[in-house]
């Protein structure tokens, strides 16, 4: 139940932020995030492709490939849920699925993903992203760390 709630929370949080960004006129952006000295900004970008607009001329692929990946992540989580342990991997998968669901909602219902976070520091200053992307990245790190820890634990048993 915890992992289902994590999926819902991550997805709904990002969708709520996207809705707030969408409700404001384009002319109200960019906005500085207070306390960051202008380094973190809220912007408004409609991304019809993969990150950085890649493949925007292939909308079917841009919708279907992330759907296939999210489905495989959901299948993996479904296989892990009945098993004890693997909490780090389960949490990572839930974060990835939640972020993916938010972006998939955008792709299928808006026709584009709403990106709104900008950090004016290299190397990330080339990208505008959203909280769903952050959850996907964090989930990837958690799942990867889980695999690394299992590998280290397996070597110690030898």
Protein language model features and the residues they cover:
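Alpha-helical transmembrane bundles and membrane-interface segments of multipass inner-membrane proteins
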Residues: 1-158
């Amino acid at each position: 139940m915890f992992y289902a709630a994590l999926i819902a929370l991550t997805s709904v949080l990002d969708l709520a932020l996207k809705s707030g960004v969408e409700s404001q006129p384009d002319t109200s952006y960019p906005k500085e995030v207070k306390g960051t000295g202008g380094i973190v900004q809220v912007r408004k970008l409609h991304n019809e492709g993969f990150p950085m607009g890649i493949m925007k001329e292939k909308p079917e692929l841009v919708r279907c490939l992330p759907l296939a990946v999210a489905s495989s992540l959901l299948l993996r989580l479904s296989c892990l849920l009945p098993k004890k342990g693997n909490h780090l991997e389960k949490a990572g998968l839930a974060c990835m699925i939640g972020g993916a669901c938010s972006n998939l909602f955008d792709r299928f219902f808006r026709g584009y993903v709403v990106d709104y976070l900008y950090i004016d520091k290299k190397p990330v200053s080339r990208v505008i992203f959203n909280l769903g992307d952050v959850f996907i990245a964090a989930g990837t790190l958690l799942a990867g760390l889980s695999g690394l820890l299992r590998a280290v634990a397996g070597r110690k048993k030898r």
